Amino acid sequence: MYDISKWKHVFKLDPNKELSDEHLEMICESGTDAVIVGGSDGITIDNVLHMLVSIRRYAVPCVLEVSDVEAITPGFDFYYIPSVLNSRKVEWVTGVHHEALKEFGDIMDWDEIYMEGYCVLNPEAKVAQLTDAKCDLTEDDVIAYARLADKLLHLPIFYLEYSGTYGDIELVKNVKAELKQAKLYYGGGISNAEQAKEMAQYADTVVVGNIIYDDIKSALKTVKAVKGE
């Protein structure tokens, strides 16, 4: 079984976006630690299954980040369940999760499931608008969410999500200093190897997403930049 605590670099693929077979092979054979399948809108069981079957041709670990209960399917190595801690809507903190447990709780393999405490920091991002996230946060606010995830809820992952814009490296550094057991994931705005390397100084896991669809060569260079191999 894979050890997610050792993952330094992951690619995130959106099932609602077009990706050629050639580029998918490049991603899966890049040396990244895992591929996460997830997105904010247009997620269906059909496009999730298509992505799963495509990725399963390769040896890379595969994770489904669940944003729609209707699109859950067996076959992934792990399932990440996001809880948007700074959402104004309880459904995105625990509501959807409660519904999922009502429907699937009896058949869940709990060894495959990890809860993510999300803090969304770009108000323009789809995920911020979907979840009505309160993004105008001070550093103290963000650190309080990190403590909530790490020390009160004992979540395995705290995820700083800048989605579409590059984040504040000092904030990432200070959040990392607060976490004792939760792993820090960083995602958002990484468009080159230099940015990926900078965030990897403090984030346990760097998530690279949108650049895959804009500049595949730059996306691939982030693997070596983060892992130093």
From Swiss-Prot:
It is an enzyme of class 2 (transferase). Its EC number is 2.5.1.n9. Sn-glycerol 1-phosphate binds at K12, Y159, L160, E161, Y162, S163, G164, G189, G209, N210. It holds the Pfam family PcrB. GO terms for molecular function: heptaprenylglyceryl phosphate synthase activity; magnesium ion binding. Mg(2+) binds at D14, S40. Pathway: Membrane lipid metabolism; glycerophospholipid metabolism. Prenyltransferase that catalyzes in vivo the transfer of the heptaprenyl moiety of heptaprenyl pyrophosphate (HepPP; 35 carbon atoms) to the C3 hydroxyl of sn-glycerol-1-phosphate (G1P), producing heptaprenylglyceryl phosphate (HepGP). This reaction is an ether-bond-formation step in the biosynthesis of archaea-type G1P-based membrane lipids found in Bacillales. Belongs to the GGGP/HepGP synthase family. Group I subfamily. HAMAP family: GGGP_HepGP_synthase. This is Heptaprenylglyceryl phosphate synthase. It comes from Bacillus mycoides (strain KBAB4).
